[in-house]
Amino acid sequence: MAKRVAITYEDFKKVAPYADALRLVGVDPVLISADEPWSLRGVDGLMITGGRDLDARSYGQERHPKSQEPNPARDRMEIGLLGEALDRDLPVLGICRGLQLFNVYHGGTLIQHIESGKHTVRTADASQPVHQVIIAPNTLLAAILGPGAHPVNSRHHQGVAQLGGHLAVSAKSADDGMVEGLERADKLFAVAVQWHPEDQVKSDPLQKRLFEAFAQAIPAHVTA
């Protein structure tokens, strides 16, 4: 039976790179949006994707003037799915907004607008790295990608402020120390990154390893 991973999304036009990355490593994507009934029944893992800013009220703040209009229904869906996945110890991979939700779920807060603009650099080719991250040794992310400096393509205007409980920081921006990777050591595979490996998976074998490791974590959980 094929491995199946739920992918959360809001804009169908933007979900293709995430789905393609999973197919590349032999996993069938199952798309889930807040517009339809959602659950993790019949799937073996969860990927939380990028998208618009989280509702600041979900971490006890008022919305910043430069924050995007939130989608509370998506926030509720992803928080519910993440809770279910962690309770069942299903493999979880968070990407960009997925890292931020991972932190908020665990009681953390966010920087609502990074004034420096260093993390919002965009290029015509989304796979092109824009800065480096430093991956911490003795973390699952280091076991997958290797410790030390790695070029990545992160692009975001929000980031982790207060770290949530049970979380370990696995990567930081080499420029300013912004959190770029989180994980839970007490779970089989609960990893989140701030950059967009789905855009690099075909051009950078190192980033493909992240999806391969995610897929390899699934067999113990394959749903009948």
Regions found by a protein language model. Give the residues of each.
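N-terminal beta1-alpha1 cap of cysteine-dependent amidohydrolase-like domains
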Residues: 1-93, 103-105, 111, 115-144, ...
